[in-house]
Amino acid sequence: MCIRDSNIGRVIARPFIGEYDNFVRTYDRKDFGMNPPGETILSYLYKNNLSTYGIGKISDLFGEMFLTTAVHTEGDSNGLEYLHNEAKNGNHDFIFVNLVDLDMLYGHREDPHGYYEGLKLIDRKIQGILDVMSENDLIIFTGDHGTDPTDGKTDHSREYVPMVAYKKNGKAEYIGDLEGFYNVASTICDFFELNNIFPGKSFLNRI
């Protein structure tokens, strides 16, 4: 089904457990997606001999391609533990992490208290990751959509998503609204001193 002629980008197998009126989504989701139609930052880094590490459902999203190492996770705490260990040990050049709990467990389920607690957990884990980063590391946090747990709907919401980039001894600067993830890709190219093949503009010098 996931072929360009059909324009079906992804088929998701999403298992649940529990009884009627009390179903819970498990972490055994499987995404069957169409391969990216062009170069991505992941494929570009991989083809330039940089080691890549996918944490979470990254492997599914990119057709199980262009990853030196990939691991499946059981929630945000587990994913951030993998990130902490990798940031500390430094075995790969590029780490791509997908965190799902705020969306899957709380946003879609209209659970603002759970969302709040999940965000606090992420905040606690992030501090440990920042502590083990070297001065040569760059970390970028962002998202591809919102899932407002208070809007009375169970679908994705359309607000602007945050983007926070951090380096030790870096600047504390607001860089304004950015249009498109390609600006992140261009910044990563700049960070690894590769030619920028994407339409965006690097903001590395403002971090």
Give the location of each predicted region.
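Feature captures the catalytic ectodomains and active-site-proximal regions of enzymes
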Residues: R4-I207
